[in-house]
Protein backbone atom coordinates (compact mmCIF):
# COMPACT_ATOMS: atom_id res chain seq x y z
CA UNK A 1 0.00 0.00 0.00
CA UNK A 2 1.36 3.39 -0.98
CA UNK A 3 1.77 6.05 1.73
CA UNK A 4 -0.21 8.60 -0.31
CA UNK A 5 -3.16 6.19 -0.64
CA UNK A 6 -3.07 5.48 3.10
CA UNK A 7 -3.09 9.20 3.87
CA UNK A 8 -6.02 9.82 1.51
CA UNK A 9 -8.10 7.02 3.02
CA UNK A 10 -7.22 8.07 6.59
CA UNK A 11 -8.09 11.71 5.95
CA UNK A 12 -11.39 10.77 4.36
CA UNK A 13 -12.16 8.33 7.17
CA UNK A 14 -11.48 10.96 9.83
CA UNK A 15 -13.81 13.45 8.12
CA UNK A 16 -16.52 10.82 7.58
CA UNK A 17 -16.53 9.77 11.23
CA UNK A 18 -16.74 13.38 12.39
CA UNK A 19 -19.63 14.11 10.02
CA UNK A 20 -21.51 10.98 11.12
CA UNK A 21 -21.11 11.95 14.77
CA UNK A 22 -22.23 15.51 14.03
CA UNK A 23 -25.39 14.33 12.29
CA UNK A 24 -26.18 11.93 15.14
CA UNK A 25 -25.85 14.82 17.61
CA UNK A 26 -28.06 17.11 15.51
CA UNK A 27 -30.76 14.41 15.08
CA UNK A 28 -31.21 12.88 18.55
CA UNK A 29 -34.31 11.01 19.58
CA UNK A 30 -35.75 7.60 20.28
CA UNK A 31 -35.55 6.62 16.60
CA UNK A 32 -32.04 6.50 15.04
CA UNK A 33 -32.64 9.23 12.44
CA UNK A 34 -28.97 10.15 12.26
CA UNK A 35 -27.92 6.66 11.20
CA UNK A 36 -30.73 6.45 8.66
CA UNK A 37 -29.73 9.82 7.16
CA UNK A 38 -26.03 8.97 6.87
CA UNK A 39 -26.70 5.52 5.42
CA UNK A 40 -29.09 6.86 2.75
CA UNK A 41 -26.85 9.84 1.92
CA UNK A 42 -23.84 7.54 1.79
CA UNK A 43 -25.65 5.13 -0.55
CA UNK A 44 -26.49 8.03 -2.86
CA UNK A 45 -22.92 9.35 -2.87
CA UNK A 46 -21.38 5.93 -3.40
CA UNK A 47 -23.86 5.25 -6.20
CA UNK A 48 -22.87 8.54 -7.82
CA UNK A 49 -19.18 7.65 -7.57
CA UNK A 50 -19.67 4.13 -8.94
CA UNK A 51 -21.85 5.21 -11.84
CA UNK A 52 -19.85 8.39 -12.38
CA UNK A 53 -16.69 6.35 -12.74
CA UNK A 54 -18.39 3.88 -15.05
CA UNK A 55 -20.22 6.35 -17.32
CA UNK A 56 -18.33 9.61 -17.13
CA UNK A 57 -14.82 8.34 -16.44
CA UNK A 58 -14.47 11.53 -14.47
CA UNK A 59 -13.76 10.35 -10.94
CA UNK A 60 -10.00 10.34 -10.32
CA UNK A 61 -8.45 7.56 -8.25
CA UNK A 62 -7.49 10.01 -5.49
CA UNK A 63 -11.11 11.17 -5.20
CA UNK A 64 -12.34 7.58 -5.03
CA UNK A 65 -9.84 6.84 -2.25
CA UNK A 66 -10.75 9.91 -0.19
CA UNK A 67 -14.51 9.87 -0.73
CA UNK A 68 -15.54 6.23 -1.27
CA UNK A 69 -12.96 4.22 0.64
CA UNK A 70 -12.23 6.80 3.34
CA UNK A 71 -15.12 9.20 3.94
CA UNK A 72 -18.11 7.03 3.05
CA UNK A 73 -16.73 3.97 4.85
CA UNK A 74 -16.60 5.97 8.08
CA UNK A 75 -19.70 8.07 7.37
CA UNK A 76 -22.05 5.14 6.80
CA UNK A 77 -22.29 2.44 9.38
CA UNK A 78 -23.72 -1.05 9.39
CA UNK A 79 -22.64 -1.87 12.95
CA UNK A 80 -24.35 1.19 14.46
CA UNK A 81 -27.46 0.46 12.37
CA UNK A 82 -27.53 -3.13 13.67
CA UNK A 83 -26.97 -2.13 17.31
CA UNK A 84 -29.57 0.64 17.22
CA UNK A 85 -32.09 -1.67 15.54
CA UNK A 86 -31.75 -4.29 18.29
CA UNK A 87 -32.41 -1.61 20.93
CA UNK A 88 -35.72 -0.55 19.32
CA UNK A 89 -39.19 -1.92 19.98
CA UNK A 90 -40.03 -4.64 17.43
CA UNK A 91 -42.22 -2.46 15.17
CA UNK A 92 -39.71 0.39 15.15
CA UNK A 93 -36.91 -2.11 14.53
CA UNK A 94 -38.73 -3.46 11.48
CA UNK A 95 -39.34 0.09 10.25
CA UNK A 96 -35.65 0.90 10.72
CA UNK A 97 -34.53 -2.16 8.74
CA UNK A 98 -36.96 -1.53 5.88
CA UNK A 99 -36.14 2.19 5.89
CA UNK A 100 -32.38 1.73 5.75
CA UNK A 101 -32.42 -0.90 3.02
CA UNK A 102 -35.27 0.47 0.89
CA UNK A 103 -34.17 4.10 1.05
CA UNK A 104 -30.54 3.14 0.50
CA UNK A 105 -31.49 1.17 -2.59
CA UNK A 106 -33.63 4.04 -3.89
CA UNK A 107 -30.77 6.46 -3.21
CA UNK A 108 -28.42 4.41 -5.40
CA UNK A 109 -31.04 4.28 -8.17
CA UNK A 110 -31.52 8.06 -7.97
CA UNK A 111 -27.75 8.58 -8.11
CA UNK A 112 -27.56 6.37 -11.19
CA UNK A 113 -30.28 8.38 -12.91
CA UNK A 114 -28.62 11.68 -12.01
CA UNK A 115 -25.36 10.45 -13.55
CA UNK A 116 -27.17 9.24 -16.67
CA UNK A 117 -28.94 12.59 -16.96
CA UNK A 118 -25.66 14.50 -16.64
CA UNK A 119 -23.77 12.33 -19.13
From Swiss-Prot:
Localisation: Cell membrane
Q: What is its main location?
A: membrane
Q: Where are the transmembrane segments?
A: 6-26, 31-51, 66-86, 91-111
For this UniProt record, the keywords arranged alphabetically read as follows: Cell membrane, Ion channel, Ion transport, Membrane, Transmembrane, Transmembrane helix, Transport
Query: Which GO BP terms sit in this record?
Result: cellular detoxification of fluoride
What molecular functions are annotated in GO for this chain?
Answer: fluoride channel activity
Topology versus the membrane, per the UniProt entry?
Multi-pass membrane protein
What InterPro entries does the entry give? FluC (IPR003691)
Superkingdom of source: Archaea
State if Repressor is listed as a keyword. no
Record's GO cellular component terms: plasma membrane
Cell membrane in keyword set: yes
Question: Which reaction is catalysed here?
Answer: fluoride(in) = fluoride(out)
The record's annotation in HAMAP family points to:
FluC (MF_00454)
**Belongs to which family?**
Belongs to the fluoride channel Fluc/FEX (TC 1.A.43) family.
What is this protein's function per UniProt? Answer: Fluoride-specific ion channel. Important for reducing fluoride concentration in the cell, thus reducing its toxicity.
This protein is called Fluoride-specific ion channel FluC 1
Annotated organism of origin: Natronomonas pharaonis (strain ATCC 35678 / DSM 2160 / CIP 103997 / JCM 8858 / NBRC 14720 / NCIMB 2260 / Gabara) (Halobacterium pharaonis)
Lineage start: Archaea, Methanobacteriati, Methanobacteriota, Stenosarchaea group, Halobacteria
